[in-house]
């Protein structure tokens, strides 16, 4: 038997249901009226802290034989020149993976293999991280390999062409064709940061990558991989000799780089919707907005708490996960983030470290849903976000989330690499002992203080939306019309679920009918 939640068509029934919807459950006080919408203004760039050149972060411990090294450069895709999008990421890849003056790329891999050593590079909007791990027995040889990638890169033309081809393939086939979830997230960046250096894909655009030359890469390396942009992280069995060796070798980098990019104010994207059209069986949904709030803001911890309640990445405790996946079977999972999130794959379900950003974003991600349920699922996410403004969490729910975070935040610092990353992030944000302070803040939060922060920072009116779907015109029409979005289930649902559905079906989506744009995914990130 199919269960269908519909909007009543008879006026009397509609009025009756509306009255019921406003009656609180027996014994509970009525919820306060919704707060007035928060101002949806622009977000200026407040500069990050700048550590001194080649600042050392040392976390020595004698109970491990593994040495961890982390070199974080204050450079990222914001440093890509106009028309050469992808230059920073390709430069970092070619230096880290393309061999050194002494060793070809293949020989570099052969040298690392018997050491069981790790060497990898990651580029984001403002930060590029070169990290390494090795047993202390192999440290002297590894240090030479590790630092030579920066000091004596091979810049092999064949490796340049190989890595550029990989980067082009990642845009044309990976981003556009194979990964609707990432496509939606990159689309959200493009929408909420339109006209800003954050807007383009970190890996580059098709035309940007095609325009690059090996000489571009060589010149860019001298401009941005410099001492004045570098923080050095060392952990494990670290002694004074290792610290001296690292700083001495890395002093071979250029002392000063290009001037920092002056980031502009981010214009509000409230109410905008971008639909990326492509052949696909499902609809991926991302929503969010740029926020002036970042680590160090008094509201950051309570807002992070609220969004953890809504849904930590891949955690079953989240409201969205339980309401949209478990109770309604809409998709695989639904999550919310207080700052930009990229999963640290291979190290749990946590956010990567060293994604420091001057202008952060808040986002909600719905894993792909059946197209017929896309608007309902989107409304559901907005409904449960708005509910946190309208009513505080119950004491039982509040204590559950607080207990979860007291333990879960310790997993964010369970490896030397993650501890180094957290410490380096704190330099830029000015938030020493960040996770300890978060756990201390949890002790003094209340349901009311969290609700107050949500009202100040998480107005649904600020949201912009991105969808990846095939029937773009049909979805656009639904978004523009604002009409209710009934849902049909394959199996019966409890009355309490259907009662909430009646509210979700009519939940206002803050989408402006004149700001719905359709873009073919086949041309996304072309230039």
Regions found by a protein language model. Name each.
Residues 70-133, 199-203, 314-346:
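M16/MPP (pitrilysin/insulinase) zinc-metallopeptidase core fold and M16-derived inactive scaffolds
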Residues 166-187, 269-282, 327-331, 335-348, ...:
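Short acidic/His-enriched helical or mixed secondary-structure segments at domain edges of catalytic enzymes
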Residues 17-19:
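C-terminal motif of bacterial Sec signal peptides marking the signal peptidase cleavage site
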Residues 53, 71, 89-91, 112, ...:
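Buried hydrophobic packing residues in well-ordered domains
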Residues 21-34, 109-220, 265, 270, ...:
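Acidic/histidine-enriched segments that form metal/cofactor-coordinating
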Residues 1-10:
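Bacterial N-terminal signal peptides that target proteins for export
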Residues 24-39, 194, 226-227, 231-294, ...:
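An aromatic/glycine/proline-enriched structural segment found at the starts
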Residues 30-47, 189-230, 257-265, 293, ...:
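Histidine-acidic residue clusters that define the catalytic metal-binding segment
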């Amino acid at each position: 038997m199919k269960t269908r939640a519909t909007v009543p068509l008879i006026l009397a029934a509609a009025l009756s249901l509306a009255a019921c919807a406003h009656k609180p459950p027996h014994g509970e006080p009525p919820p306060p009226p919704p707060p007035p919408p928060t101002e949806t203004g622009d977000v200026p760039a407040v500069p990050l802290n700048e550590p001194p050149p080649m600042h050392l972060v040392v976390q020595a411990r004698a109970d491990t034989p593994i040495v961890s090294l982390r070199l974080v450069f204050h450079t990222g895709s914001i440093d890509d020149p106009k028309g050469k999008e992808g230059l920073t990421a390709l430069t970092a890849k070619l230096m880290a993976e393309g061999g050194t003056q002494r060793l070809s790329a293949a020989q570099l891999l052969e040298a690392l293999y018997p050491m069981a050593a790790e060497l990898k590079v990651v580029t984001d909007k403002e930060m590029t991280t070169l990290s390494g791990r090795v047993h202390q027995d192999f440290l002297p040889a590894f240090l030479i390999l590790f630092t030579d990638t920066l000091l004596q890169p091979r810049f092999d033309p064949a490796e340049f062409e190989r890595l550029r081809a990989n980067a082009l393939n990642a845009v044309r086939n990976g981003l556009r064709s194979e990964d609707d979830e990432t496509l939606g997230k990159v689309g959200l960046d493009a929408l909420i940061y339109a006209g800003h250096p954050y807007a383009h894909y970190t890996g580059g655009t098709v035309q940007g990558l095609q325009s690059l030359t090996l000489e571009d890469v060589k010149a860019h390396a001298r401009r941005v991989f410099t001492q004045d942009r570098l923080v050095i992280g060392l952990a494990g069995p670290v002694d004074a000799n290792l610290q001296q060796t690292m700083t001495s070798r890395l002093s071979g980098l250029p002392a000063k780089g290009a001037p920092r990019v002056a980031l502009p104010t981010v214009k509000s994207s409230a109410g905008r919707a971008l639909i990326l059209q492509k052949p696909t069986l499902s609809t991926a949904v991302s929503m969010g907005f740029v926020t002036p709030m970042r680590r160090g803001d008094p509201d950051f911890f309570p807002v992070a708490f609220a969004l953890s309640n809504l849904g930590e990445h891949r955690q079953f405790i989240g409201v969205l996960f339980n309401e949209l996946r478990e109770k309604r079977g809409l998709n695989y999972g639904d999550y919310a983030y207080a700052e930009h999130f990229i999963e640290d794959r291979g190290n749990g379900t946590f956010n990567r470290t060293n994604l420091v950003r001057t202008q952060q974003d808040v986002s909600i991600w719905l894993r792909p849903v059946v197209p017929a349920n896309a608007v309902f699922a989107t409304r559901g996410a907005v409904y449960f976000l708005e509910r946190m403004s309208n009513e505080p969490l119950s004491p039982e729910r509040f204590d559950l989330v607080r207990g979860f975070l007291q333990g879960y935040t310790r997993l964010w610092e369970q490896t030397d690499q993650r501890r180094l990353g957290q410490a380096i992030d704190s330099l830029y944000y000015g938030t020493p002992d960040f996770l300890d302070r978060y756990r201390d803040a949890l002790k003094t939060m209340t349901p009311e203080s969290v609700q107050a922060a949500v009202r100040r920072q998480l107005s649904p009116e600020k949201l912009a939306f991105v969808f990846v779907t095939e029937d773009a015109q049909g979805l656009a029409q639904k978004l523009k019309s604002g009409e209710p979005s009934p849902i049909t289930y394959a199996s019966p649902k409890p009355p309490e679920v259907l009662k909430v559905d009646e509210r979700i079906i009519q939940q206002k989506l803050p989408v402006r009918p004149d700001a719905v744009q359709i873009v073919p995914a086949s041309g996304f990130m072309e230039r």
